[in-house]
């Protein structure tokens, strides 16, 4: 199928979803439950990375020689015009929390199936800038964390990691700029409870790893027992 036809179909289904929210975001079929965002057929077609089963997977390699991360993984591949991109757009720009709940549920399934994630004491969502929070009304990573816990992962939620100021997004900087900027990207508050605890940092999409690297540097002040990372998606470049 030509790319332009796929693009037209994608925009058409997104348009329908604005007015008929109980249809599948991908194929447009009726959904059986109001909490769904994808039908069972489209959910079954999600592109899993299976990074959790790989030694030295691409996400782990992002942090080699930079920050101590015991284990890192991403659940799905993120590419343009994909189901995963639609889910992220729905969550971040259309305020569709059901998309975040789905992404969190899928991560919870992966955590239960993979002992490399254990133990987990705290889930730590990557915070967003204050202006984005005001505009969006919520932090998408927090929605994913809440869904992970709601789907059976016994961990506490820590929200003491804060964005320090409204800086340019990390993706607009080169690696050297990101590294020099990382120490001022986050503030950490009320962190005494994290000492010797096992932390799982959670975000929606990982591209370069720079933002999570900065979070790890800030969290190191708390002297945690271990730090692990999971994201809903990994940008395939």
Placement of each model-derived feature along the sequence:
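Glycine-rich phosphate/pyrophosphate-handling loop used in enzymes and phosphotransfer proteins
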Residues: 1-202, 207-237
């Amino acid at each position: 199928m030509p790319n332009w036809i796929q693009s037209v179909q994608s925009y058409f289904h997104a348009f329908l979803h604005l007015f008929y929210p109980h249809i599948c975001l991908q194929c447009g079929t009726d959904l059986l439950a109001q909490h769904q965002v994808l039908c069972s057929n489209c959910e079954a077609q999600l592109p899993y990375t299976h990074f959790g089963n790989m030694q030295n997977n691409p996400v782990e390699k992002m942090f080699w020689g930079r920050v101590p991360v015991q284990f890192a993984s991403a659940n799905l591949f993120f590419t343009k015009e994909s189901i995963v991109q639609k889910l992220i757009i729905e969550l971040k720009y259309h305020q569709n929390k059901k998309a975040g709940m789905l992404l969190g549920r899928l991560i919870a399934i992966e955590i239960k199936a993979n002992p490399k994630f254990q133990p987990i004491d705290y889930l730590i969502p990557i915070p967003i800038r204050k202006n984005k929070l005001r505009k969006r009304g919520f932090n998408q990573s927090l929605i994913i964390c809440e869904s992970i816990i709601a789907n059976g992962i016994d961990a506490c939620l820590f929200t003491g990691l804060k964005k320090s100021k409204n800086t340019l997004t990390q993706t607009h900087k080169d690696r050297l700029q990101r590294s020099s900027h990382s120490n001022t990207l986050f503030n950490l508050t009320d962190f005494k409870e994290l000492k010797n605890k096992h932390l799982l940092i959670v975000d929606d999409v990982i591209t370069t790893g720079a933002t999570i690297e900065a979070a790890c540097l800030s969290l190191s002040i708390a002297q945690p027992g271990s730090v692990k990372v999971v994201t809903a998606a990994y940008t395939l470049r």
